[in-house]
From Swiss-Prot:
Compositional bias annotation for Low complexity: 50-74
Keyword Metal-binding: yes
An example Gene Ontology biological process: neural crest cell migration
One GO CC annotation: nucleus
Protein purpose: Zinc-finger transcription repressor factor. Plays a critical role in maintaining the identity of epithelial lineages by suppressing epithelial-to mesenchymal transition (EMT) mainly through the repression of ZEB1, an EMT inducer. Positively regulates neuronal differentiation. Suppresses cell cycling and terminal differentiation of keratinocytes by directly repressing MYC and NOTCH1. Important for the correct development of primordial germ cells in embryos. Plays dual functions in thermogenesis and adipogenesis to maintain energy balance.
UniProt keyword annotations, A-Z: Developmental protein, DNA-binding, Metal-binding, Nucleus, Phosphoprotein, Repeat, Transcription, Transcription regulation, Zinc, Zinc-finger
The protein's name in its UniProt record: Transcription factor Ovo-like 2
Reported phenotype of the disruption mutant: Mutant embryos are small and die at 9.5 dpc-10.5 dpc with an open neural tube, impaired extra-embryonic and embryonic vascularization, abnormal cardiogenesis and placental defects. Reduced number of primordial germ cells in 8.0 dpc embryos.
Compartments it resides in: Nucleus
Domain of life: Eukaryota
Binding partners and assembly: Interacts (via zinc-finger domains) with CEBPA (via bZIP domain); the interaction inhibits the transcription factor activity of CEBPA and is required to repress adipogenesis.
Region span, Disordered: 1-88
């Protein structure tokens, strides 16, 4: 039998509250034990009016706010010999030492500010940032700016076009090290490792992974954009990637390419003089 179906034995000293008598709309309230009500630093108003007596405070602190104890019924807690012996000043200390089982229901009290949310007028989607809304609005454009050179299908984003073109070229840069199966996207590889091989990724939540720079002509992958530029410049001089590369990077790479050539030329001249 799987361990998830096994029932653990509960410790005898833990008092569990029964939620069957409460309505559904009040089961998510925070449970504050009656015995700990008088230990609050700021007692409710009815406790102050009673002169700070422990009986008045305990009766009003059974539920949050002190006013719901009369409207909602509360399950009687079992009496233990420890509570009978702990009367007077030691009663609260004994109650604090007794473990209390609290509800595992998670709830939030915050509300979203509608002024911060940016809504799409066409489909009703909401976004936190204006730039995300602007990127989303591109999918509603009837005119597709980026066309596939193989089949003519249009896309509004260059990333979507690159992902589609790989289905024609067969380039799959993300390869599984276990079964050598390759994928066009990193997310597909991560999903394959988790579902098929049970390999969990070791990076933290929202942590940026090492980016791969892929040559769309032959499938070469490099750790930096400079490595990709050097590869395309040497093996694919007529590639469109060189035209789309920024002028600053192109000038930088040209300097790196010419410097070794100049050094080789100077060395050859010195050897000829000798």
């Amino acid at each position: 039998m799987p361990k998830v179906f096994l029932v653990k034995r509960r410790s005898p000293g833990v008092s569990v509250r029964s939620w069957d008598e409460l309505p559904d709309d009040k089961r998510a309230d925070t449970y504050i034990p009656v015995s700990l009500g008088c230990l609050l630093r700021d007692p409710p108003e009815d406790c102050r009016s009673d002169g700070g007596s422990s009986s008045g405070c305990s009766s009003s602190a059974g539920e949050p706010g002190g006013a719901e104890s009369s409207s909602s019924p509360r399950a009687p807690e079992p009496e233990t010999p420890e509570l009978h012996d702990a009367q007077g000043t030691d009663g609260h200390l004994a109650a604090m030492q007794r473990p209390v089982a609290r509800s595992k229901i998670k709830f939030t009290t915050g509300t979203c500010d509608n002024s911060v949310i940016h809504n799409c007028d066409l489909c009703g989607k909401s976004f936190r940032l204006q730039r995300m809304l602007n990127r989303h609005l591109k999918c509603h454009n009837q005119v597709k700016r980026h066309l596939c050179t193989f089949c003519g299908k249009g896309f509004n984003d260059t990333f979507d076009l690159k992902r589609h073109v790989r289905t024609h070229t067969g380039i799959r840069p993300y390869k599984c090290e276990v079964c050598n199966k390759a994928f066009t996207q990193r997310c597909s590889l991560e999903s394959h490792l988790k579902k098929i091989h049970g390999v969990q990724q070791q990076y933290a939540y929202k942590q940026r992974r090492d980016k791969l720079y892929v040559c769309e002509d032959c499938g070469y992958t490099g750790p930096t954009q400079e490595d990709l530029y050097l590869h395309v410049n040497s093996d694919h001089p007529g590639s469109t990637f060189l035209k789309k590369t920024s002028k600053k990077l192109a000038a930088l790479m040209q300097n790196k390419l010419t410097s070794p050539l100049q050094e080789n030329s100077t060395l050859s001249e010195e050897e000829e003089k000798k």
